[in-house]
Amino acid sequence: MTLNNLQLFAHKKGGGSTSNGRDSQAKRLGAKAADGQTVTGGSILYRQRGTHIYPGVNVGRGGDDTLFAKVEGVVRFERKGRDKKQVSVYPIAK
């Protein structure tokens, strides 16, 4: 009497797993107002992480380094020294 050792194999491999397949949402950083644009007080001018652009005249900096207008006026992106940039808001003369 012979004993047959019959072994069955799966015809499809298991699903497995991976450590990839995720991505964080975009943070929508960057300029929110263009050079020469008229803005109102409190308007966001530039969203950033760190100080890529510094606040100039009539511009404040929020806790997350967001730059915002303090007064109504015209936006100007300017150079600050040789290697820095700043954004200012100049009031419109009435």
From Swiss-Prot:
Q: Which GO terms describe its biological process?
A: translation
Q: Where is this region: Disordered?
A: 9-33
Record's GO cellular component terms:
cytosolic large ribosomal subunit
Any chance you could tell me the propeptide residue ranges?
A: 1-9
Q: Which residues form the signal peptide?
A: none
Reported modifications of this chain: The N-terminus is cleaved by ribosomal processing cysteine protease Prp.
Gene3D superfamilies, A to Z: 2.40.50.100
Which UniProt key words apply to this protein? Ribonucleoprotein, Ribosomal protein
Classification via Pfam families: Ribosomal_L27
Q: Which GO terms describe its molecular function?
A: structural constituent of ribosome
Homology family? Belongs to the bacterial ribosomal protein bL27 family.
Q: What is this protein called?
A: Large ribosomal subunit protein bL27
Q: Which organism is it from?
A: Streptococcus pneumoniae serotype 4 (strain ATCC BAA-334 / TIGR4)
